[in-house]
């Protein structure tokens, strides 16, 4: 019953939003001049971004966008994949309809990005095993970001 009530109130979205706020406030948000330093945050956020909303069509205040709204509105982080591919939607999971894996960095580090992509090839394309129902090699695709640190 509690789980259904939480689902009805989008509790998972709100919880993840509080988590990202805590993470950002206690890392990049706790440092003076962080926007001028080399900072990076990446991973499976299990949430969608307003930068991809042309793909999803959520209303502006939808809770599914809370996590990345916080990052984009309250930190100096840049979404590396979307910034390198502004007119293209590149999914990061096997269902091909969602991007929930992100690489963020500050401008001084972003300026050193040579290339960035989500890798879809014969090896990385997720395949669901009919016996175990697990994805091989993973249900998420690798994200490759190449930096010139010279």
Model feature map: region roles:
Residues 1, 43-46:
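Short loop/turn segments at strand-loop or loop-helix junctions that form parts
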Residues 1-20, 54-56:
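Surface-exposed cleft-lining segments at the edges of enzyme active sites
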Residues 29-40, 47-150:
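Metal-dependent phosphoester-hydrolase catalytic domains
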Residues 11-24, 62-64, 137:
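Soluble or luminal CAZymes and related metallo-dependent hydrolases
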Residues 21-25, 43, 69:
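Internal, well-ordered alpha-helical scaffold/interface segments
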């Amino acid at each position: 019953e509690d789980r259904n009530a939480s689902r009805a109130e989008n509790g998972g979205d709100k919880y993840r939003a509080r988590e990202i706020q805590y993470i950002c406030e206690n890392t990049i948000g706790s440092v003076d001049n962080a926007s001028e330093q080399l900072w990076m945050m990446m991973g499976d956020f299990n949430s969608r971004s307003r930068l991809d909303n042309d793909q999803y069509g959520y209303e502006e205040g939808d809770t599914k966008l809370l996590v990345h709204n916080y990052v984009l509105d309250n930190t100096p982080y840049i979404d590396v994949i979307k910034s390198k591919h502004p007119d293209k939607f590149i999914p990061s999971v096997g269902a091909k309809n969602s991007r929930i894996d992100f690489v963020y960095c500050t401008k001084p580090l972003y300026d050193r990005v040579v290339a960035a992509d989500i890798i879809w090839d014969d090896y990385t394309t997720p395949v669901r095993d009919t016996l175990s129902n697990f994805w091989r090699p993973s249900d998420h695709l690798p994200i490759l970001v190449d930096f010139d640190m010279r």
